[in-house]
Amino acid sequence: MDRIHITGGTPLNGTIPISGAKNAALPLMIASLLTGETLELINVPRLADIAALTRILGNHGVDHMVVGKRPGQTAETGQTVRLTASNVIDTTAPYELVSTMRASFWVIAPLLARFGEAKVSLPGGCAIGTRPVNLLIMALEKLGAEIEIDGGYVVAKTKNGLRGAEIVFPSVTVGGTHVALMAAALAYGTTVIDNAAREPEVVDLAECLIKMGARIEGAGTSRIVVEGVARLGGTRHEVLPDRIETGTYAMAVAMTGGDVSLVNTRTDLLASALETLASTGTEVTALPDGIRVRRNGGGISPADVTTDPFPGFPTDLQAQFMALMTLAKGQSRIRETIFENRFMHVQELARLGARIRLDGDLAVVEGVERLKGAPVMATDLRASVSLVIGALAAEGETQINRVYHLDRGFEALEAKLARCGAQIERVRA
């Protein structure tokens, strides 16, 4: 099993290109099942989760082609992928494939909407609380689907096609909003989605669906209206920048000191996180093609954070921000309101010398003067990258085990950090 070795204490300086967002690319790839024409996606990151979904789509009969690199592209540049679902041979998504990644469960929506049936295994993926699929199933039932759970599979059918309806989510759900959008796009009549997720990745999916011929209004607000159409066509769409990768590297710069330009990204994708970061004494400046993050000298000021759905502070940056706060000059309080059991990184950060106390959904961080390198173990995607951030600032060497979690969500992480001066190396098993 691969490990990452980091010798900390070096400020980061230079430029880091931001990849396309995994959390946008996954639903966009799944949307290829809505049409028999080709969907071309630009700036798709090279990640384990992308490869896993490609296998799942291939199991359904979707043709997949990676277009060659353009001049000037590097290994850190996203790929262009063409997906064609003109010969779907199977509407079953088996356990051995779906269990590798939760988002693959979303294939149930386009399969049901286009073919009238789907049999999809209950999902796997990061073990963060329960993360139930009940809201996704509720949305499909509102649209007229007949659903039963049989042998660990969700079996969905519709006799005469899906029909528009009012869907009111009791809590904000990104996955539920993705599923509702894709299903409603091919449903008869009008669908209203209330308490819809407002995340940029939802907007990106809606914009792609509109290019494919869908009629959608209100994406980016809590009320989305979808007028179903008879068919969707192919299109070409560029995946939006990864706001979580952007925030992760911004916090790494803040923790180590230095001056880094994050390019191919936008401030509006994570305004709340950048505002919080600025309150810690880090200089954050918008650039024409990205964001400049600088902290040259001076201590890290403590700040309190509560995770919230967009436009609030992202839960996917909670672990990274906690790592930053371990070196703050004072106490900070971090409350997690989105997922249960998302403090699994606390025990491993403590191995580096962090002082963190947990009380339910609240983590109280007492800043320390320094961290010291130690062997640590990644438990999930975001926890693993928080350990990378901590290790970059720690004295001495840190060995991070189980880094396959990182490969699920961060493209060319070692190369991007190394080009800014980090002493980081992957040791192959």
From Swiss-Prot:
It comes from the Bacteria. It holds the Pfam family EPSP_synthase. GO terms for biological process: cell division; cell wall organization; peptidoglycan biosynthetic process; regulation of cell shape; UDP-N-acetylgalactosamine biosynthetic process. The keyword Cytoplasm applies. Belongs to the EPSP synthase family. MurA subfamily. Cell wall formation. Adds enolpyruvyl to UDP-N-acetylglucosamine. This is UDP-N-acetylglucosamine 1-carboxyvinyltransferase. It comes from Methylorubrum extorquens (strain PA1). The gene is murA.
